Amino acid sequence: GNWCCSARVCC
């Protein structure tokens, strides 16, 4: 699944 690496950046 996708996860957020940063406040506005999802990997």
Curated annotation (Swiss-Prot):
GO molecular function, one term: toxin activity
GO cellular component terms attached to this protein's record: extracellular region
Keywords, alphabetical: Bromination, Disulfide bond, Secreted, Toxin
Domain of life (superkingdom): Eukaryota
Tissue specificity field: Expressed by the venom duct.
Subcellular location: Secreted
Modification sites for 6'-bromotryptophan: W3
Disulphide-bridged cysteine pairs: C4-C10, C5-C11
Family recorded in the similarity comment: Belongs to the conotoxin T superfamily.
Domain notes from UniProt: The cysteine framework is V (CC-CC).
UniProt-recorded name of the protein: Conotoxin Mo1274
